[in-house]
Amino acid sequence: MPIIKSAIKRVKTTEKANAKNSSQLSKMRTAVKKFEKAKTAGADNVEQLFNEAVSAIDKAQSKGLIKANKAARDKSRMAARLAK
C-alpha cells in the first residue's frame, strides 16, 4: 500500500484504467465470438456481426489495447472466414 500521495493517486488511476481496458477487450472478444458462432450456425446477420467485430477490433487497436498487426491479422482472418 503506497504512502506517498502521488503513488496513491496512481493506484486509483491505474485501477480505473485497468477496468476500462478490460471492459473494452472483453467487448472486442465477445463481438468476435458472436461472429464466429453465427458463421458456424449459418445465421442471416453474419455481415452485421462481422462489421461490429471489425469496429470493436479497430476501437481496441486505436486505444492501444492490441497492436496494429494483431488487429489486421484478426480482421483478415474474419474476412476470409466470411468469404467461405
From Swiss-Prot:
Any one Pfam family match given in the protein's UniProt record, by short name:
Ribosomal_S20p
Q: Kindly list the GO CC terms recorded for this protein.
A: cytosol; small ribosomal subunit
Keywords, in A-Z order: Ribonucleoprotein, Ribosomal protein, RNA-binding, rRNA-binding
Which GO BP terms, alphabetically?
A: translation
GO molecular function, a single term:
structural constituent of ribosome
Report the superkingdom from the record: Bacteria
Family statement drawn from the similarity comment of this UniProt entry = Belongs to the bacterial ribosomal protein bS20 family.
Q: Which NCBIfam families match?
A: S20
Q: What does this protein do?
A: Binds directly to 16S ribosomal RNA.
Mind telling me what this protein is named? Small ribosomal subunit protein bS20
